């Protein structure tokens, strides 16, 4: 028996054809570029004709594969080399953003070209966002006029939702920030964005991508202050953006104040230390006293676990608030602060149903402890209260208010007799 393995026959000199689906098309952006530029040259500067050409070409050319090349051409007139320069040996077109007039109306017209293209070929959306992020990193490679056009275009595209505000991350590039390119670009961008929408819409878009608290990073670390930001953008004609950032900073400072205040209270820090800290924060962050009393009130009320039984919670509240009266009194030196506190108490007692019967007792306690005075209480009773539970609370306060009025009249007549 032959134990040797039988040799398998081989086919020599035979060539096998690769299946069509296994063939990989060669990546050739130059050929794609030539087709697009030739078409744009034929359409000329009529942007409606450009939009129609791009719409029709998507059926013949591979936009999905050559998205970056397509957008390079539409923005810069040709394929961009790293750093943002146009290759000398490549074809170029003047039918592009950078060769257009430097005005908002022209950029709005170009924005429509991008809108139509991306609406027609939805898969280009991601590629376009990546392109804009790249272009922002290349800003130093562009002329000032090119940067201005790109900024205006980006602002319009952010306003109409073609772009997501996350693209602004590219502006926080260290080199762009250090050389002042980011801040200058942001001025033009926000002007066109706010011109299309308003500051509230801009703020909502920034909040959506957690960019609302990062705008100061457009400046180097040594210039990241509210004062510098507001001065720079107000002088550039963007007062509403300056005010928005100032408000954001104030909101952040208030949250930080409340957090620190609650920690100090839970540690049992002396009131004099807490008062000193709060007053320093008020001065540093320009927080008015009526705002601070609201923060102190909610901090005081959140430091205790309240009894769920209505008949016991009033007694517990009075005991707790009596202890904190000196702290509250330190921040009711203005009539408006007292009125704010009264409204906070009203809202708290309404929102926490077990406190509904405690409202009058809390107000009387604060009157005796000189946290509240007659005039704001009478004003609250007459016309400064809010709708929440007003019939219940006004009824509770009726006798005390009558007593206050009588006491006031008696003191007035005593003063007249003394004269």
From Swiss-Prot:
Keyword Methyltransferase: no
Gene3D superfamilies in UniProt: 1.25.40.180
Domain W2: 247-414
Disulfide bridge partners, by residue number: none
Residue positions, PTM Phosphoserine: 12, 411, 413
SUPFAM superfamilies per UniProt: ARM repeat (SSF48371)
Modified residues (N-acetylmethionine): 1
A GO BP annotation: regulation of translational initiation
Molecular function per GO: cadherin binding; RNA binding
Crosslinked positions (Glycyl lysine isopeptide (Lys-Gly) (interchain with G-Cter in SUMO2)): 368
Function: Translation initiation regulator which represses repeat-associated non-AUG (RAN) initiated translation probably by acting as a competitive inhibitor of eukaryotic translation initiation factor 5 (EIF5) function. Enhances histone H4 gene transcription but does not seem to bind DNA directly.
Protein name from the UniProt record: eIF5-mimic protein 2
Organism: Homo sapiens (Human)
Lineage, broadest ranks: Eukaryota, Metazoa, Chordata, Craniata, Vertebrata
Gene, per the UniProt record: BZW1
